[in-house]
Regions:
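Glycine-rich phosphate/pyrophosphate-binding beta-alpha loops
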Residues: 12-13, 38-44, 87, 124-128
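A structural signal for short hydrophobic beta-strand segments in well-ordered beta-sheet cores
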Residues: 21-24
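A short core secondary-structure module
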Residues: 30, 34-78
Length: 180
């Protein structure tokens, strides 16, 4: 089965704690969930989704709880698959909850500890996202160095011109910084 991670919301931008998706605890221990999440990788095909929702707005980040959502249950809806310029091997969509009932068994960890869980996943994920960028940059740098040695202008390789050397040096400095 394929899973997904649902933290981002249409209006929250980079502030993940500014979420509006709410989970209201019921007398029987279940939660009724309402709200939207956006840019959910594997959302169009996921059977299970780890969802983060506000259970206590007064507590900020400590009022966010994680849930394991079964997309086959009533109250869960998928939006259209979003067009993307890259990383098209994994489909992305918006998801919506309308009176989705999550049982107490669907809570991951403890009530209010969801954001701590999300942060741990995000920290590891950021390395995974940055790594391909560094690899692509390394390849671009090598290609640029080869090109400036080969391409000639005014009878000499363009790599002999000071402005080109400065651009290549800047590229190398930025690449070295990214690799750290």
């Amino acid at each position: 089965e394929i899973g997904a991670f649902a933290l981002t919301e249409p209006q929250s931008g980079s502030d993940a704690t500014a979420m509006r998706c709410k989970a209201v605890k019921q007398a029987d221990g279940s939660y009724v969930i309402n709200g939207k999440k956006s840019w959910i990788t594997s959302g169009p095909v996921a059977r299970y989704i780890i969802l983060f929702a506000v259970t206590d707005p007064a507590k900020g980040a400590k009022g966010i709880t994680a849930f394991m959502i079964d997309t086959a249950k009533p109250g869960f809806h998928r939006g259209k698959t979003e067009p993307k310029l890259g990383i098209r091997a994994s489909a992305t969509c918006e998801i919506e909850f309308q009176d989705y009932v999550a049982t107490a068994d669907e809570v991951l960890g403890e009530d209010g500890h969801g954001f701590k869980l999300a942060r741990g996943v995000l920290d590891a994920g950021r390395i995974g996202i940055a790594s391909p960028g560094v690899g692509l940059s390394r390849g671009a740098y090598k290609a640029a160095v080869a090109y400036v040695k080969e391409r000639k202008s005014f009878g000499q390789p363009i790599g002999s011109f000071q402005m080109i050397q400065a651009k290549i040096a800047d590229m190398k400095c930025r690449l070295d910084a990214a690799e750290i």
